[in-house]
A protein has these predicted regions:
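Conserved small/polar residues in nucleotide/adenosyl-binding loops
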Residues: 143-147
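Short beta-strand-loop-alpha-helix junction that forms the active-site gateway
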Residues: 133-142
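Metal-dependent nuclease catalytic cores that hydrolyze phosphodiester bonds in DNA/RNA
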Residues: 1-128
Length: 147
């Protein structure tokens, strides 16, 4: 299982509103669910499709994805297309934009031992484009703290 930061970006909605909750939750087993695993599988598929489209040597994870489906494939392809669109757009003002997929992001300068994972980070000169893939049910607001 992936390592999680004590003050993780994904749990910031909780610890910003209730700072003691970070300490109280320490040591409590982080139990996954079907929905969380499906999201993890789709993130893995998304990363693969983007990396392939960028010409990188990556292994197809499809046969190892527990929740793989045609719908998941369609969602991942839409994500890939969006990332590639943003990458192409960034080439209009930067000759060599960089794309990082599933990149560890360290914000420990502001939060002790703080880090998270960026689904897609595009660096194009002075522009930083962060794309956070969301999968599953529920609405995501632009006010969501991880965005």
């Amino acid at each position: 299982m992936a390592k999680h930061a004590f003050l993780s970006a994904s749990a910031s909605h909780r610890w910003i509103n209730c700072p003691p909750s970070a300490k109280l939750c320490e040591g409590i087993k982080d139990e996954s669910s079907h929905y969380a695993q499906e999201g993890t599988d789709c993130h893995e598929l998304c990363a693969y499709l983007v990396e392939m489209a960028l010409g990188r040597d990556v292994e197809d994870p499809t046969e190892n994805l527990t929740y793989y489906s045609g719908e998941m494939q369609n969602c991942a392809e839409e994500y890939r297309d969006y990332v590639l669109e943003q990458f192409e757009r960034s080439k209009k003002f930067c000759s060599d934009p960089m794309v990082f997929i599933e990149q560890r992001l360290d914000f420990s300068r502001w939060v002790e031992n703080g880090f998270g994972t960026g689904d897609c980070v595009i660096i194009a000169d002075e522009v930083l484009h962060i794309i956070d893939y969301k999968h599953g049910l529920g609405a995501v607001s632009y006010t969501h703290l991880t965005l």
